[in-house]
A protein has these predicted regions:
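Conserved catalytic-core motifs of GNAT/GCN5-like acyltransferases
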Residues: 69, 77, 119-122, 134, ...
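Conserved beta-strand-loop-alpha-helix junction that forms the acyl-donor binding cleft
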Residues: 94, 120-130
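A short beta-loop-alpha structural element at the N-terminal edge
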Residues: 4-19
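Acetyl-CoA-dependent GNAT
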Residues: 34-92, 103-104, 109, 163-164
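Conserved acetyl-CoA-binding loop-helix of GNAT-fold acetyltransferases
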Residues: 95-109, 130-135
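Conserved GNAT acetyl-CoA-binding A-motif
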Residues: 110-122
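Helix-loop element at the rim of GNAT/NAT acetyltransferase active sites that forms part
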Residues: 19-36
């Protein structure tokens, strides 16, 4: 097992990113997506040049094991210094610190961009994600009970925030 490397995603990573993500809409309530977004969606996310938009991957040797990205929390200009974040890992990357490494690098970039607040929306139950967000300093600010319907069951989301400035 080699050392994990975290850095900016490239267009050549997007097929691997899509393959990692594809598992989650099909099998889990970790995302409330029910279908895989098209490759063009991932490319648009990668191509965004808005301040505070980042797309990172974590690798072991040449294999992409996970990804993290940040984007607009809301489109209205007053929200410009608030970003929403997401992290997804391949199953074989779990338990290796890959998620925390990705998130830590993403938060460093957001601090450098002078982002004020980071928001994470975590579908429940998700004890692993909850623990990672707590360890990174996020605080829980509320829960939207039964806000989504997936696999015939209602899913709640917990909202977390981290103040960077």
């Amino acid at each position: 097992m080699s050392e994990l490397w975290v850095g900016p995603a490239q267009s050549s990573d997007l097929v691997a990113v899509a393959a990692i993500y594809d598992h989650w809409p099909r099998t889990s309530t970790a995302t409330l997506d029910v279908m895989q977004p098209p490759l063009s969606w991932w490319q648009a996310k990668l191509d965004s040049t808005d301040a505070g938009d980042h797309f990172l991957v974590v690798r072991d040797d040449d294999a992409v094991l996970g990804f993290a990205y940040s984007g607009a929390f809301r489109t209205r200009p007053a929200y410009a210094l608030t970003r929403e974040t997401s992290v997804y890992l391949a199953r074989q990357a779990m338990g290796r610190g890959a998620g925390s490494r990705l998130y830590s690098e993403l938060l460093w970039l957001l601090r450098h961009d002078r982002v004020h607040l980071v928001v994470a929306v975590v579908a429940q139950p998700n004890p692993t994600s909850n623990a990672m967000h707590r360890a990174l300093g996020f605080t829980e600010v509320g829960t939207l009970d039964e806000v989504g319907l997936k696999f015939g069951s209602y899913v709640s989301t917990t909202w977390r925030r981290l103040r960077l400035s």
